[in-house]
From Swiss-Prot:
One of its GO terms (cellular component) is plasma membrane. GO terms for molecular function: cellulose synthase (UDP-forming) activity. Residues 20-37 have a biased composition (Low complexity). The lineage of its organism: Eukaryota, Viridiplantae, Streptophyta, Embryophyta, Tracheophyta. Thought to be a Golgi-localized beta-glycan synthase that polymerize the backbones of noncellulosic polysaccharides (hemicelluloses) of plant cell wall. This is Cellulose synthase-like protein D5. Keywords: Cell wall biogenesis/degradation, Glycosyltransferase, Golgi apparatus, Membrane, Transferase, Transmembrane, Transmembrane helix. Its EC number is 2.4.1.-.
Amino acid sequence: MSVDYANYTVLMPPTPDNQPSGGAPPAAPSAGGARPGDLPLPPYGSSSSSRLVNRRGGGDDGAKMDRRLSTARVPAPSSNKSLLVRSQTGDFDHNRWLFETKGTYGIGNAYWPQDNVYGDDGGGGAVKMEDLVEKPWKPLSRKVPIPPGILSPYRLLVLVRFVALFLFLVWRVTNPNMDALWLWGISIVCEFWFAFSWLLDQMPKLNPINRAADLAALKEKFESPSPTNPTGRSDLPGLDVFISTADPYKEPTLVTANTLLSILATEYPVEKLFVYISDDGGALLTFESMAEACAFAKVWVPFCRKHSIEPRNPDSYFTQKGDPTKGKKRPDFVKDRRWIKREYDEFKIRVNSLPDLIRRRANALNARERKLARDKQAAGDADALASVKAATWMADGTHWPGTWLDPSPDHAKGDHASIVQVMIKNPHHDVVYGEAGDHPYLDMTDVDMRIPMFAYLSREKRAGYDHNKKAGAMNAMVRASAILSNGPFMLNFDCDHYIYNCQAIREAMCYMLDRGGDRICYIQFPQRFEGIDPSDRYANHNTVFFDGNMRALDGLQGPMYVGTGCLFRRYAIYGFNPPRAIEYRGTYGQTKVPIDPRQGSEAMPGAGGGRSGGGSVGGDHELQALSTAHPDHEAPQKFGKSKMFIESIAVAEYQGRPLQDHPSVLNGRPPGALLMPRPPLDAATVAESVSVISCWYEDNTEWGQRVGWIYGSVTEDVVTGYRMHNRGWRSVYCITRRDAFRGTAPINLTDRLHQVLRWATGSVEIFFSKNNAVLASRRLKFLQRMAYLNVGIYPFTSLFLIMYCLLPALSLFSGQFIVATLDPTFLSYLLLITITLMLLCLLEVKWSGIGLEEWWRNEQFWVIGGTSAHLAAVLQGLLKVVAGIEISFTLTAKAAAEDDDDPFAELYLIKWTSLFIPPLAVIGINIIALVVGVSRTVYAEIPQYSKLLGGGFFSFWVLAHYYPFAKGLMGRRGRTPTIVYVWAGLISITVSLLWITISPPDDSVAQGGIDV
């Protein structure tokens, strides 16, 4: 049984038995003596706590005794998840805080003084216990290292496997198979690449860590009464939340509305939360669906606050299994839930009926316009009827400025005006409690009735402009939100991802606002999914990546940005360098060198107006240096010509700083700087937000090049995160005990392969661009560079993987093998490499918390995707780079599911795509090869079954990886589309004829084989 030990620092007070030797007893402190709050704060991790006790009347240095007590805690349960559970917020351990700052008698070390004081028993100058608990000194987060009993063997096994691979490859090179040099050569090339690929993937995993956030400390520091905040008003910074959508028919508006409701109801100060949705399609359906969601939010949000509902996505809440009354204490919960459920059902009906309602409204109003035009034409206006267009109308009887149902110039999906509509205005700065009688059915007494601000955005699109897809939409939201709210932090969501844990944002803030948090550019949350089949056939959960690779990167420079569920520092998105940036010099970046803050920094606009919401911009030496190095007149060249936007940059940087509550906190802001109410929005501000999302605003600026989301790749998220890491920023991986966010993932085989194809295509684009990690700056750590290099290289493994998957079949066809004989040395190396791989897998499962089945599913889909989507991505990328030809892979056939009520009906849909051809070929060739090999052995004059061992075993191993693919092609109850049989037959006939042509059968076939 393992026992964890926590160190305490115990400081002995000046008692009669604890006096300095050879000195007079110290005088008792007077009533007017210095109190703890009047003394300078000690730095973390120093002996300042000892000096503090001494200055309180403990005598000279001889009066201090520093002792450590080791107290054993109850060991955590033995399971894969024990490490994760222990590292989360609910089990935050303040022992380390006590050790790092000032563990004293009053905080539970040795004993609790009966009179609750230090020093004299009744002196007026005694220091009270309350004075010792000074909240600014408590850290908001901490690292939880992986136990050495797991990590040390893991690293040792990596070294052992590396040595084994090296010796194996040396042996393979020095022992060629002279009877089949072509087979030996192909296998050698593949094995060298696999070893290189394994190193790129494995080396960044050498330092995984866990983290823990302290929500209680966050509340105590930012939302509790203090001398600078007497009323306990929230001093947290503002947060802008972005939702992205593009097509209301591909991304159902009801799903988007539920995402919006979960965000509006999250636990964050209402006056500090601002929500935006970017509708890149400019659809009236999305606009009116959001308006319906805002109306429903007026009852849903207070209901969630009153009864502490979780999750706060109404669709997920009402469909989850289990007893809804569990943990609910209010007697009116059942009545309230029944009423709100009925309201939600009516809300769904209204949202689902909107397409028909909008169509009928448009038809009616267009008919009216045509009638009026005919009347004018009859009165003599010949062009009246020709000028009438089939418009789409809003509910107030005006033309919709976005995309019309029947597209026309200035009203098409790629050609429409900017739209900004603030649907929910800034809430009141003070809490607005409900009262009895405010609602006819719900008692909202003492419930905060305010709802966060919400705005609908649709950027301008015009023909002839490159709108840069999602990256362009995100940059438009960044600019508009800077004008309207200017939250120093931004959180982005896809429209199908919602907040599952209403405390998740607060946990992220613990890292951003902790000491040193000003160097963190973003907090990435793991992606969790709902609606996945229980067996996770196509590895949709992807836990090996999210719980393994990303957790390991957190121990380096931080996880990559992988899309939805990421909280950004606005200042970092603007392309600025981090404070106190360092370079990693030397062969492996082992030397850290601080750099001049002016070096390579961006323009720092001067502080000015902007919508700051309280507080002023600090003027420390670093910001002055930035401003001096890059005058303000350069800012429009980078950020555009909006003066209001440029003035907001310095305000956002200042508000995003940690509190300057300790000498060790550099580049901080004073407590209480963000307590002032925000000014209300006015027409000029909204007009400016419309201007900054126009299609011409980015002309002659650095948006998409160095500022904002980076253009030029379909995986703009990875490139954007890479650019920030390359400037020296750090990121943090935030795994919460309860999933922070949840979303949906494609469970259909074709959709899953096309998703992987898009990711792999983006990686190939990264490899052939200036974002290749080989060209990274010295601010990127060596192992972090390897991780980003692997991102650009991994699709190319498909070229070697498909050859290696065909090697067993070629061995069975030819009667040869990759080695001349099954030498004991070869088998020993193979056994050692396999055993070390299995042991590494077991230890990785231990420190990451993933399951063995999840690991195996990931391995299977790596082979499936590697021989289909990755291969297509490499082909697509090479054709684009070399010949400038762009190709696409489309769906050509679809088999309908039988049971529409089955939640996993999509799993059984078979939509034919050309991506199926390579895996089908590998499966067909290996099956035929097994038949040929078995037949050759069975019908030989002298059967030698041992000759099947090499090729037969590896061929079976390849087929085992393709089992989920084959099962997916069978559909439900074996209803496989005809096209699958056609391709399988074509492949079989082609392979058979090809082999007969190359190696016609003769009487000597029976003598073929490998020597054992």
